[in-house]
Amino acid sequence: VGGRGALGPWWVLFRAGNSTVGVFGVFLGAMLALGGLPEGDFALISVLQALSVWSFMCSWNALNDYLDLEIDRVNRPDRPLPSGAISEASAKRGIALMMTLSVVSIAGAAATASGTVGGIEGWYPSLAIWLGALFLLTNYESAAPFSLRLKERGLPGNIAISLSVGMVVLFGAAGVFEPFNHRAWTVFVIGVLYTLAREIVKDVEDMEGDEGRSTYAMQVGPQRARTLAWALLLLTLASMLLPFAIGIFPELHLVGVIPALVVLMLAKPKLVLSEDHAAQQLIKKSMYLCLAALLGSSLLA
């Protein structure tokens, strides 16, 4: 399960390494909005919000594994829960602990914001975004009667995941009192499209183990799912280029996103050849290259 001693299974259950992407997302949003690193109270708010996102994502990842235990006995028997490395009772406590840490961190950010010039009112959009992410989480994972049960609805579930990923950037921008910053919203749109395409391809990749689940790929078949994923990637490409055309980012900085465009285009032949794992990995690499380029452009502008 991992080479990190007693913490190894927990590291895997929480996907703690992958969850650090949320930390990057918060600071990305803040730096896009400010054109540089946050300082003073803004720096403290950003750190607390980054911790809140990290622990929120850890909790979400563990909850997903907990609810998918039977599926993972087929798909991923080496995961901490199906392998027995972590008990179900311990996992529930870990999920609650991480969500508590997220709540405490967001409360700390609120307390810090209340002492700034903008006051708590200027910070409220951050709270709205956090609550929005919590709404998506509960309605994605929960099978309760009042839940939207997004996980069981195929594409709406993929959209919920994608929105929650993109919202991290807006969360970071809102933390520095810039919730409507154009650069942050541009990256939000790009991130949502990238993630949605990748989630669909990952569903195709997992079709064998997802038998009985109503994923989009299971509903329409692998070829139609791959076609939609590619259409979304073309929209992603357009959303990467448009901000340079309308002045949100300087035209001269367009060269910075060329590597991301090239890697994105490499995903097409992989989809045609049904090499779904390779395709979704290329999509992820392209997204990271794009985010790095847009951050660099924002800092240099």
Predicted regions and their residues:
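Extended hydrophobic alpha-helices typical of membrane-associated regions
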Residues: 3-8, 25, 145-154, 224, ...
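Membrane-embedded alpha-helical segments that form the functional core of polytopic membrane enzymes
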Residues: 23-67, 102-107, 123-138, 180-201
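Lipid-exposed faces of alpha-helical membrane segments in multi-pass integral membrane proteins
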Residues: 20, 24, 28, 51, ...
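Solvent-exposed interhelical
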Residues: 52-103, 192-240
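Transmembrane helix-loop junctions in multipass membrane proteins, especially transporters and channels
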Residues: 34-38, 69-70, 110-118, 142-146, ...
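Functional transmembrane core segments of multi-pass inner-membrane proteins
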Residues: 33-48, 159-207, 223-240
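Intramembrane alpha-helical segments
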Residues: 3-12, 20, 83, 89-180
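Hydrophobic, membrane-facing alpha-helical anchors
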Residues: 2-3, 70-74, 132-145, 183-186, ...
